[in-house]
């Protein structure tokens, strides 16, 4: 499961684009944050991070600047820094969203903090902005988090719910086979 987490790119792109759209729609941002957002959109993560850091250093638009830094670090796969930046974004007024919680959960998984990942995935699903695709992704990620914690029974329970909603998900069907080797079925 951990290897499959490292290889997901389609969802990663969707998450980043969603956060970028929110950042661009935010009114009242300084030109520094807007410049950083434009650089981020262009894929210039180093330059974008410099702009967001400049805004942080000046104490301007802290929530947006930290969120921008989080996305830059995320794109560079520096999950430790991304997690810290997203946390700072939330502490500085950035809106709590399902997307940020999913990204925080993935950061926690990638940095071997599965208990935190469980928290983020479970709570992130409660936000009203969580669309169907994001809920599906977070549900699957929650299973991965429980596996990493070592709670295979809970992972199996979550997998049963997941497959009742998404019965044709081949990745989940393969994962269920693995979970069945870790936890005997109830009939046994």
Feature locations, PLM:
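Canonical tetratricopeptide repeat
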Residues: 68-71, 102-103, 137, 141, ...
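Alpha-helical segment of the N-proximal tetratricopeptide repeat
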Residues: 30-58, 75
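Short coil turns that delineate tetratricopeptide repeat
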Residues: 60, 94-95, 129, 167
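Start-of-helix register in tetratricopeptide repeats
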Residues: 30-31, 64, 98-99, 133, ...
């Amino acid at each position: 499961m951990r290897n499959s987490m490292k290889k997901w790119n389609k969802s990663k792109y969707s998450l980043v684009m969603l956060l970028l759209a929110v950042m661009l729609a935010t009114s009242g941002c300084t030109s520094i944050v807007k410049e950083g957002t434009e650089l981020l959109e262009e894929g210039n993560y180093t330059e974008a991070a410099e702009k967001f850091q400049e805004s942080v250093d000046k104490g301007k638009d802290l929530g947006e600047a930290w969120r921008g830094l989080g996305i830059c670090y995320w794109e560079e796969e520096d999950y430790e820094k991304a997690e810290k930046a997203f946390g700072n974004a939330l502490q500085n007024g950035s809106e709590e969203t399902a997307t940020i919680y999913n990204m925080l959960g993935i950061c926690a998984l990638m940095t071997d903090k599965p208990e935190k990942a469980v928290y983020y995935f479970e709570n992130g699903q409660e936000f009203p902005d969580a669309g169907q695709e994001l809920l599906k992704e977070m549900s699957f990620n929650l299973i991965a988090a429980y596996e990493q914690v070592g709670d295979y029974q809970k992972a199996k329970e979550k997998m049963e719910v997941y497959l009742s909603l998404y019965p044709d998900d081949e990745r989940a069907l393969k994962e269920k086979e693995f979970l069945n080797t870790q936890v005997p079925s109830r009939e046994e």
